[in-house]
Amino acid sequence: MEHIADNLKTFIVNSSSEERILYTKEFKWIGYTKAKIILDKMVDLTTYPKGHRMPNLLLVGESNNGKTALLKKFCRSHQSYVDEKTAKLKCPVLMIQSPPEPDEKRFYNAILNSVLAPTKTSEKIENRQNRVIHLLKELEVKVLIIDEIHHVLAGTISKQRLFLNVIKYLSNELNIPLVCSGTKLAFNAIQTDSQLSNRFEPNILVRWENNTDYKRLLASFEKVLPIKKRSNLIEDKLSNKILLMSDGLIGEISKILELSTILAINTTSEKITLDILNEIDYIAPQNRKKAFFNNGIY
């Protein structure tokens, strides 16, 4: 089992099929070059000196192409802690999800809920804003992450402008970098405010292509799949098939390998083959709408 990471070999030998299947379903972070570059940039933001104009980062990618997983990886590396000298809670990185539509009150509530602070329905919006600013300063938040920022576009033009002004005001008051993330619509959302757009550096997670980085990604995946035989995922027929099925989205690649690993365990073949890939219960992203039409749903 030379294809398996050393810390996984003992687990595979001593575990039942059910235990290995359960392990397969657990999320595993698979690093890759572009993710490392973006993570390094975000780490740099946590130590950036406070100044007149703080740098911001905009993470753009298609749905299921690794944006949220990357952000959560960053958050896990910068968890809240209690300062031993002051006995106060510190939260260097705070991540929230943008509300489904641009709404100032719901935005503040998302922040308050994330730090387990109470929310009051009757509280005036300016008081809520002041409380958010006070709490984030007390927690010494270094970077604020707003995921699904493209939700801004779900509102009217006036609501979009108001919401973006709220974000801009919060950033100015706290004097900290922002990281916003979303689909390609996120870029359009930020571009509606010229001042904000100039502050954000866009970083794009593109679809995977059949190149060295993609083969390296598959090799990394194979090291954490709890099956006993080498599948050699980087072999052309397998790698091409996985890329075609996944439509180049890392979330889909992960799901395909999860389903294939489970089938390989259940059939005792203990390796991923073309037959296994053809047998898994999976519909490629580009074929899902077609499947609805074919089944008379539309």
Q: Model-flagged regions — what are they?
A:
Residues 93-94, 99-120:
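Conserved NTP-binding/hydrolysis module of P-loop NTPases
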Residues 153-155, 165-233, 237:
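The catalytic "switch" region of P-loop NTPases
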